[in-house]
Swiss-Prot record:
E.C. number(s) listed in UniProt: 3.1.1.4
Family: Belongs to the phospholipase A2 family. Group I subfamily. D49 sub-subfamily.
Residues given in the record as Ca(2+) binding sites: Y55, G57, G59, D76
Residues annotated as the enzyme's active site: H75, D120
UniProt enzyme class: hydrolase
GO-annotated cellular components: extracellular region
Gene3D superfamilies assigned: Phospholipase A2 domain (1.20.90.10)
Lineage: Eukaryota, Metazoa, Chordata, Craniata, Vertebrata
PROSITE patterns: PA2_ASP (PS00119), PA2_HIS (PS00118)
Annotated catalysed reactions: a 1,2-diacyl-sn-glycero-3-phosphocholine + H2O = a 1-acyl-sn-glycero-3-phosphocholine + a fatty acid + H(+)
Cofactor binding note: Binds 1 Ca(2+) ion.
Protein name according to UniProt: Basic phospholipase A2 paradoxin-like alpha chain
């Protein structure tokens, strides 16, 4: 084997090893991302909603910094209600839905799926009507979310 081929093979192996450390998103979060794109045809990447304010992203505490952050707080509470009512895991719950223009519409069977889908649809619609303020992206949550 030529040395150049060995280098390419080594590079592929190293990159695959690095990629194996990146955890995949739960499928529900991927669905939620598509739902956000449906409701909100803005050009902002969905990833910008993952680290916004005190509630958009993992966890959440304190007072929401604005209307958009409040959407995330309500979404978190909705998922908490799904866990209590239906003993399901919202982040792992897949559901069926369609996009009609800018309106996500849930058409799923089980109570848990329907509830989680409605949580996501309401949040996506809330995101669409709430202004995005760059100053609230990637904030110091320890200082601002008390």
């Amino acid at each position: 084997m030529h040395p150049a081929h060995l280098l390419v093979l080594l590079a592929v192996c190293v990159s695959l090893l690095g990629a194996s450390d990146i955890p995949p998103l739960p499928l529900n979060l991927a669905q939620f991302g598509f739902m956000i794109k449906c409701a909100n045809h803005r050009s902002r990447p969905v990833s910008h909603y993952m680290d916004y304010g005190c509630y958009c992203g993992k966890g959440g505490s304190g007072t929401p910094v604005d209307e958009l952050d409040r959407c995330c707080q309500v979404h978190d509470e909705c998922y908490g209600e799904a866990e209590k009512r239906f003993k399901c895991v919202p982040y792992m719950t897949l559901y069926s839905w369609k996009c009609y223009g800018t309106a996500p519409s849930c058409n799923t069977k089980t109570d848990c799926q329907r509830f989680v889908c409605n949580c996501d649809a309401k949040a996506a619609e809330c995101f669409a009507r709430s202004p995005y303020q760059n100053k609230n992206w990637n904030i110091n949550t320890k200082a601002r979310c008390k």
